[in-house]
């Protein structure tokens, strides 16, 4: 009877193979509550996952590739679990990521300009070989 009921269930190794994730990652996702509605245990103690968990793992992987953290993904999955489509919240998260990337790019441009300025001065005034108080006087403002 148990085998008939479990035919639509995947062991963790099978799920890892099909999803492209490691067993360790899947266990971690289960531990932090990302897979809770889709996990059962067999009578012998094996984790058994509903085949729909593959869609859930694909969503997690894609959301991470777009820059969302697991902490940001978890509430989106909770909305889905309550029967809601989380697309508006996903859109909001992606817009926040775009803003954060823009701010980071500005900071990197500023850092790049500072590095170029230091290297320009470096060429004009090579460091002396004499030791002094500064570890490298060329990078001191």
Labelled PLM ranges:
Residues 1-78:
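Basic helix-turn-helix/winged-helix DNA-binding cores
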